[in-house]
């Protein structure tokens, strides 16, 4: 992908709070199902913001860091999803979202970020991302010392 969009921890917190505001009133939700692994951090932040104590995971494997591959459902809660928020960090091609809709037709599917190919599958999201953009999530990055410019020229 030719473009990158970097999300800092502060930005992720802000985006998740914005997403949480759209899910009010909180007492309408039985719980949160976070899609592992990308939805784990946003799911935890939403659980905190909404005061939701019941958090479970849906484990679907479709990426090896930056390469999409065949989708495998590793763990899935029972039911049709009624009363649950399914939380993702990103909807990209929409393949995972389509699978989630098939598995849980009555759940509310939300994500922090959405690309054009998948955003119509979501009930809510907060950040539009161009299709040709790779997202660097804060949990995939590390802070590092940067040499001052004047020292690089010696």
Curated annotation (Swiss-Prot):
GMP binds at residues 69, 92-96, 134-135. The keyword Hydrolase does not apply. 5-phospho-alpha-D-ribose 1-diphosphate binds at residues 37-38, 69, 88-96. InterPro entries: PRibTrfase_dom (IPR000836), PRTase-like (IPR029057), Xanthine_Guanine_PRibTrfase (IPR023747). Guanine binds at residues 92, 135. Its cofactor is Mg(2+). It is found in: Cell inner membrane. Pathway: Purine metabolism; GMP biosynthesis via salvage pathway; GMP from guanine: step 1/1; Purine metabolism; XMP biosynthesis via salvage pathway; XMP from xanthine: step 1/1. Purine salvage pathway enzyme that catalyzes the transfer of the ribosyl-5-phosphate group from 5-phospho-alpha-D-ribose 1-diphosphate (PRPP) to the N9 position of the 6-oxopurines guanine and xanthine to form the corresponding ribonucleotides GMP (guanosine 5'-monophosphate) and XMP (xanthosine 5'-monophosphate), with the release of PPi. To a lesser extent, also acts on hypoxanthine. This is Xanthine-guanine phosphoribosyltransferase.
């Amino acid at each position: 992908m030719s473009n990158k969009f970097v999300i800092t921890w502060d930005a992720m917190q802000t985006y998740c709070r914005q997403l949480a505001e759209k899910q009010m009133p909180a007492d309408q939700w039985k719980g949160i199902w976070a899609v592992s692994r990308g939805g784990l951090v946003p799911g935890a932040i939403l659980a905190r913001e909404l005061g939701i104590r019941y958090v479970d995971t849906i484990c679907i494997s479709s990426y090896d860091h930056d390469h999409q591959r065949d989708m495998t459902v590793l763990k899935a809660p029972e039911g049709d999803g009624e009363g649950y928020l399914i939380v993702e960090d990103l909807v990209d091609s929409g393949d995972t979202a389509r699978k989630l809709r098939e598995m849980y037709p009555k759940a509310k599917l939300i994500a922090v970020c959405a690309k054009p190919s998948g955003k119509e599958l979501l009930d809510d999201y907060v950040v539009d991302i161009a299709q040709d953009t790779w997202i660097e999530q804060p949990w995939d990055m590390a802070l590092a010392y940067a040499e001052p410019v004047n020292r690089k020229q010696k």
